[in-house]
Amino acid sequence: MEKKDMLYEGKAKKIFRTDDKDTVVVYYKDDATAFNGEKKGTIEDKGVMNNSITAMLFELLEKKGVKTHFIEKINEREQLCKKVEIVPLEVIVRNIAAGSMAKILGLSEGRKLDTTVFEISYKNDDLNDPLINDYHAVAIGLTNFEELKEMYSIAEKVNNTLKEFFDEQGINLVDFKIEIGRFNGELLLADEISPDTCRLWDKKTGEKLDKDRFRRDMGNVKEAYMEILKRVNK
């Protein structure tokens, strides 16, 4: 495998072509953003930690029957992945009220929800990734109902697997977002699963071990990511 020119740069990763049209190299950066890019900073070694955390969690999910774009970890900052066409939607899964959901619905943060909540947002930076419903997504040509049903099924499998796994590590999986890509007629879990994309709270203390520490200027951001890496790597 030969790494070639950069295909795309996002907020947290760079994507490079390879000599194989079906694969890309994903490079994890230390850049941190919040509030749709309005707040910017860096977290030392975040890319290294998120690369490792994502690799381990994707391997776990593959073993549990969730197909992903992940092929292998190349080095401390890079992964080899299948080159997918990202569906321009994020699927958000919520087990406990927090963040925007708590604010919009007037719920106390930390309230356990009576059922898991699934939401979708339209991946569009200019519009600040608005929440939409299934009918919006189909009406504007982002997907179809059959594909959406499969996306929700993938999200549910990811939630069931990760909730159980993190529970064993003494962590509550509060909520998370995933991206899904199309590849040779299949849907694959793509992007990353890390403290950047999940809310993770210590079960005993309630301590936040995720990007909320950066969003809310709580300090000890690197230490929180390191703690997640340590527990995932047990």
Swiss-Prot record:
- What organism is the protein native to? Clostridium botulinum (strain Langeland / NCTC 10281 / Type F)
| UniProt catalytic activity | 5-amino-1-(5-phospho-D-ribosyl)imidazole-4-carboxylate + L-aspartate + ATP = (2S)-2-[5-amino-1-(5-phospho-beta-D-ribosyl)imidazole-4-carboxamido]succinate + ADP + phosphate + 2 H(+)
* Top-level EC class as recorded in UniProt: ligase
Kindly give the Pfam families that the UniProt entry links to this protein. SAICAR_synt (PF01259)
What is this enzyme's EC? 6.3.2.6
InterPro entries registered for this protein in UniProt: SAICAR_synt/ADE2_N, SAICAR_synt_PurC, SAICAR_synth, SAICAR_synthetase, SAICAR_synthetase_CS
Gene Ontology MF terms:
ATP binding; phosphoribosylaminoimidazolesuccinocarboxamide synthase activity
HAMAP family cross-referenced by the UniProt entry: SAICAR_synth
Q: Which biological pathway?
A: Purine metabolism; IMP biosynthesis via de novo pathway; 5-amino-1-(5-phospho-D-ribosyl)imidazole-4-carboxamide from 5-amino-1-(5-phospho-D-ribosyl)imidazole-4-carboxylate: step 1/2
Q: Name one GO biological process term.
A: cobalamin biosynthetic process
This chain belongs to which protein, by name?
Phosphoribosylaminoimidazole-succinocarboxamide synthase
- Give the family, as the similarity comment puts it: Belongs to the SAICAR synthetase family.
**Which keywords has UniProt assigned to this entry?**
ATP-binding, Ligase, Nucleotide-binding, Purine biosynthesis
